[in-house]
Amino acid sequence: MTDASKRTVRLRAEHDGDNSRYLDASLDMGGSLVIKGQDLGPATAIVSSDGEYEWTSTFAPVDIPALVALLGGAEGADILDVLESYTDRRSYELERLIRDSDVPHSLFTWSG
């Protein structure tokens, strides 16, 4: 395992009453970028019967340069370094940019 595959960027860790929201990014062993989110609490009721909603967006290594460019990073920049500027409240902007872009990625969602 490389050092890069061990690194995780905490994009969001929010707590508001009974609700919590988390978002993390890391590189997997194959070099894909994996962004994982988890929402817990009554605010998830619209999508989850048990108070938990999870999702994972995965970007293949070949698509990471396009994501770096979308996020304003320099050519060749480390995606995890670029993502360091999208933490806390800015993590919502990150999600919007990804959602509105044509950068290829897979999306997996789970709710109880």
Where are these regions (language model features)?
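Short, charged/polar N-terminal "headpieces" of proteins
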Residues: 1-34
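A short, structured beta-strand/loop element
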Residues: 24, 29-61
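Mixed-charge, Lys/Arg-enriched low-complexity segments
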Residues: 47-112
